[in-house]
Amino acid sequence: MKPNITFILCCFLLLPNLSKSAEKKVYGLNEYVRLIDIDLEVPAKLDTGAETASLSARNIKYFKRHGERWVSFKLAIDGSHTRVIERPLEGIDQIKRRADDRGSHDRSLYSNRPAILLTVCMGEASRTIEVNLTDRSAFQFPLLIGSEALKRFDATIDPALRYAIGKPRCASIAQKAE
């Protein structure tokens, strides 16, 4: 009789963990994401092995506005994105470089990337996340969303799925103004 009580107690201890996993949303390895601040939809790779989020950008320039540090850039997605985007600089992220990204004379293990805050929408959920800027034009996906941002979405990633939650359904800035 005693082993049955132990088993029942163990089951009750596991119940809170089961309810937590039920609350998480299952996303695919790739999802469509709306960058609400920029009013643009892009395909993204959801990568639990990366810590930060990265957006493909070029012509990155730092400047000051009213004593604050800002960054300007153009999206490095395709030739049609020529608009200059300006955002407050949130900070500088140090990103560990892959060995094949370093030249024979370049010994630095980290690259410094400007980081900004962007509001992103996946499915019906929108969150403000930190995104660093780097030229990702050699990659298939212009946006990589890492584990820190995925935590904010309470996301569980199923790598067997692609575009599991469909198109973003959050209101854009233009829709909110109406």
Question: Where are the language model's segments positioned?
Answer:
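Bacterial N-terminal signal peptides that target proteins for export
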Residues: 1-7
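Bacterial N-terminal signal peptides
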Residues: 7-16
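Pepsin/retropepsin-fold aspartyl endopeptidases
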Residues: 21-178
